[in-house]
From Swiss-Prot:
Cystine connections: none
GO biological process: 'de novo' IMP biosynthetic process; cobalamin biosynthetic process
Protein name, per record: Phosphoribosylaminoimidazole-succinocarboxamide synthase
GO CC terms, sorted: cytosol
Organism listed in the record: Shigella boydii serotype 4 (strain Sb227)
SUPFAM superfamilies per record: SAICAR synthase-like
Keyword terms, alphabetized: ATP-binding, Ligase, Nucleotide-binding, Purine biosynthesis
InterPro entries: SAICAR_synt/ADE2_N, SAICAR_synt_PurC, SAICAR_synth, SAICAR_synthetase, SAICAR_synthetase_CS
Tree of life domain: Bacteria
Catalytic activity from the UniProt record: 5-amino-1-(5-phospho-D-ribosyl)imidazole-4-carboxylate + L-aspartate + ATP = (2S)-2-[5-amino-1-(5-phospho-beta-D-ribosyl)imidazole-4-carboxamido]succinate + ADP + phosphate + 2 H(+)
Gene designation per UniProt: purC
Sequence intervals crossing the membrane: none
Length: 237
């Protein structure tokens, strides 16, 4: 499957058309951004690591019965995916307090959240991805009530699957975001799951092993990503 025209260039990925109108090529670049794209740097191997990491996670979620857009790996930095009609709202699950939740509520970082919190954010970099709720989604027609309920159900199911897998690898799945779209009327998991869109801490030391290393200028970004991948059993080379 050959990539053709560039359809969309995001902060860290590029989407291309193919000869099949139902399939796209998703390319992971070495770019890393913070502050809604205000700060961007390149890291060797990052595109490869995130591509293979994403393929591994999507495969495990598919095995658990969660429909995903993933078709197959094409190269170290590219995969073939179904073309989805993307919902402009991100789903976030929080197992522990971190990031914007800590700032918003003034609570201590790291406290366990039981049951996990479920948040919705409008995908809009210019507006810094504002937090919304189910009422907004219905009023503004971003997604139907039925499809949003399905997105929430699949997000919690993904959390159950991944929380255990990361725990078995000596990692805490602090929080993560998922994006969904429609494929022939069905809600399907799209975009990616990688350390770019999740928070992952070492279970013993609480060391941050995700993009917070870049956001907070901690250093060792790729080393942390590769360490997480190895613990999970992702084949990188």
């Amino acid at each position: 499957m050959q990539k053709q025209a560039e359809l969309y260039r995001g902060k860290a990925k590029t989407v291309y058309s193919t000869e099949n109108p139902d399939l796209l090529v998703l390319e992971f670049r070495n770019d890393t951004s913070a502050g809604d794209g205000a700060r961007i740097e390149q890291f060797d191997r990052k595109g490869m690591v995130n591509n293979k990491f994403n393929y591994f996670i999507m495969s495990k979620l598919a095995e658990a019965g969660i429909p995903t857009q993933m078709e197959r790996l094409l190269s170290d930095t590219e995969c073939l995916v179904k073309k989805l009609d993307m919902v402009p709202v991100e789903c976030v699950v929080r197992n522990r307090a971190a990031g914007s939740l800590v700032k918003r509520l003034g609570i201590e970082e790291g406290i366990e959240l039981n049951p996990p919190l479920f948040d919705l954010f409008l995908k809009n970099d210019a507006m810094h991805d504002p937090m919304v709720n189910e009422s907004y989604c219905e009023t503004f027609g971003w997604v139907s009530k039925e499809n949003l309920a399905r997105m929430k159900e699949l997000t919690y199911k993904a959390n159950d699957v991944l929380k255990k897998r990361f725990d078995d690898a000596g990692l805490i799945l602090v929080d993560f975001k998922l994006e969904f779209g429609l494929y022939k009327g069905e809600v399907v998991l799209g975009d990616e799951f990688s350390p770019d869109g999740s928070r992952l801490w070492d279970k013993e030391t609480l060391e941050k092993m995700d993009k917070d290393r870049f956001r907070q200028s901690l250093g060792g970004l790729i080393e942390a990503y590769e360490a997480v991948a190895r613990r999970l059993g992702v084949q990188l080379d």
